[in-house]
């Protein structure tokens, strides 16, 4: 019974669930003929939270895709880069297999984490590979820019801000965050400025590498709740980074020179062997990168050691850029055709225009990243007029449009209708 009478004939209310009286709890909330105390409410919240976390864990533990399936998924969105995709597929599969292994108690063999370093020119697909992996595995993903990071105590973001951003993406679900993928771009920009010690402090170089080292190898990071600032008298959210997969990427401009100096060493003086300078491309040289080259470039040995999987991406040529424009599921040409279709117009980009776009991107040295801006610029006037013109049914783009020597050919609705009628007339004449 929710109500009981005391000695003074006063009604004492009781919780309908645990039967504690109103004097034994802090708060008793009344409903239609029932009462619930604050302790029972807390217990219910804990049960709901545990069930939600168990559901999230079950989703993570669901059938893990094989390396072949991972690469096949990457092939749908990323053109070329077969070698790096195979390396990524194996590394990611082993990483999440390692997490499962860690959940088995009583096994003496402890598997170490295989974080990944992607080396490749600008616009070669480093960021896209990391994003696509996270989407396939249905795990939280956060991207950070290494150039904005500084040592703790200096103006700028410290490395724990990355974990804070990750928690925000996960709605502060710590269990989910601890199995995420973190991609740190421009890692080459925090290399040591020189091998010589300096009286000035390198707050965005070696110091940041040292701070990242702890995070990458696995530590318990303390993050202020709900994105607040750190101050001594507050509770922190504890996030263990041991099972977070870190992928770092960078263009590493100048690394090819370090590799060339190592691989093409020759003596000096009259007795030195005379060898012609090889004409190997940047991508080919990157493929020969060794840990010693990365250390000489400016990364600290400890950080290089924590990134055992090094995948080097090839420089994209004209043919690869044309494929990127047309073949992936979310190819740029398909995106623009969908935009034009929303205005009841068909966008026809001729093959010579595709090659012109690719050549322009190569000249600008922007890789795949520069393709959109070239296409946006070429179609700007057409997209400006299209919504108000109303009767444009087809837009044809050739190489002259891309090179700035012409304008897109616009075909209007009445022209389409006229051509259809003339075609029908020709059919009737032929039949007669």
Curated annotation (Swiss-Prot):
SMART domains: AAA, ClpB_D2-small, zf-C4_ClpX
Pfam family, one: AAA_2
Location of the ClpX-type ZB domain: 3-56
This protein's record includes keyword S-adenosyl-L-methionine: no
Binding-site residues, Zn(2+): 15, 18, 37, 40
Keywords for the protein's UniProt record, in alphabetical order: ATP-binding, Chaperone, Metal-binding, Nucleotide-binding, Zinc
Gene Ontology, cellular component aspect: HslUV protease complex
GO BP, one annotated term: cell division
Family statement drawn from the similarity comment of this UniProt entry: Belongs to the ClpX chaperone family.
NCBIfam families listed in its UniProt record: clpX, PRK05342.1
Name assigned to this protein: ATP-dependent Clp protease ATP-binding subunit ClpX
